Amino acid sequence: MKHSVLAGLFATGALAQGGAWQQCGGVGFSGSTSCVSGYTCVYLNDWYSQCQPQPTTLRTTTTPGATSTTRSAPAATSTTPAKGKFKWFGINQSCAEFGKGEYPGLWGKHFTFPSTSSIQTHINDGFNMFRVAFSMERLAPNQLNAAFDANYLRNLTETVNFITGKGKYAMLDPHNFGRYYERIITDKAAFASFFTKLATHFASNPLVVFDTNNEYHDMDQQLVFDLNQAAIDAIRAAGATSQYIMVEGNSWTGAWTWNVTNNNLAALRDPENKLVYQMHQYLDSDGSGTSTACVSTQVGLQRVIGATNWLRQNGKVGLLGEFAGGANSVCQQAIEGMLTHLQENSDVWTGALWWAGGPWWGDYIYSFEPPSGIGYTYYNSLLKKYVP
């Protein structure tokens, strides 16, 4: 989820030119449609164009507000779907990463940890994976390769152990957007050191899943590849060989742009062959997940078909690690269509996770926190249809 980072991204829209990898077009976009020198505005879909390096083989926009010049339509259906059940279906747990910029912050004031009673409620309903967001700055204060903070690690471990002690999967989500103290992570050795310590701590728990980072964005594409590979290598070298690893892509790891933005990630290698490509998808006009309005009843299906084809063509499997929609009939139909498509293609889609639960979400438009979260009260009965 973009959180306040999204606001910062849109705030740059009034600049004269879009920076490297930033948005430069799309329905409802009001920022600059030109890019800095060496980059060109590339059409990805009707809602999102991005400043990408030249030369490029992708189709580009020509004038501000214009549609792309030679855009081909996405495939209407994927090939050879395989119906079945999901391996994982669950809920994001978001609260330990709250209090952005308040580091280390105070537990109970700036951040908290998930409610085990709420997680138990979800487990009782059949959900079997929980993606636990946390802050790298709190776990490794001041330096990315620093020793872990004992108190924060203990609280994180207690949450993980509660989930896995019930026989369910706990995904460790460094919710940092490829950044550390607001700066893009470029020190691959320090990044690897972080994952060496994290994997060493959890290596004996086979129900732990490692996520390399939440929603890389506006970054050099090769750097995104290198950070993912560094995390994979560090996790395996630390002895965590039985666990799955989730890799994420650039452009907020969006499913709707994956096949044209993150194609190089197909070359990632895991000696244990347990990589899962995690994508996120929201259904509002700009895909940001900040509105209760969905574009149409078909938008969910439309936005994941390209990713389905990419996974199958490259022999990969994926997880929709974040999705949500407003509490209304249009979004409900869009979500149901999207989830049904993923389930019908369960040879390449391992599952999906709603964004988000957590005790501090209050009246947030997608809150899945029992008993009264808006998303929970509106969507729980629907989502239970898809649990493994």
From Swiss-Prot:
Q: Which PROSITE patterns match?
A: CBM1_1 (PS00562), CBM1_2 (PS51164)
Q: What is the lineage of its organism?
A: Eukaryota, Fungi, Dikarya, Ascomycota, Pezizomycotina
Q: Segment Linker: which positions? A: 53-91
Q: How is it used?
A: Used as a detergent cellulase. Sold under the name Celluzyme by Novozymes. This special enzyme has three effects: colour brightening, softening and removal of particulate soil. The overall effect is that it helps to preserve the nice appearance of new fabric and restores old fabric so that it looks new again.
List cystine links. Answer: C24-C41, C35-C51
Gene Ontology terms, MF aspect:
cellulase activity; cellulose binding
List, from the UniProt record, the residues annotated as the active site of this protein. E215, E322
Indicate the family of this protein: Belongs to the glycosyl hydrolase 5 (cellulase A) family.
Q: Which domain of life is it from?
A: Eukaryota
Q: Which UniProt keywords apply?
A: Carbohydrate metabolism, Cellulose degradation, Disulfide bond, Glycoprotein, Glycosidase, Hydrolase, Polysaccharide degradation, Signal
Span list, region Disordered: 56-81
Know the name of this protein? Answer: Endoglucanase 3
State its Enzyme Commission number(s).
Answer: 3.2.1.4
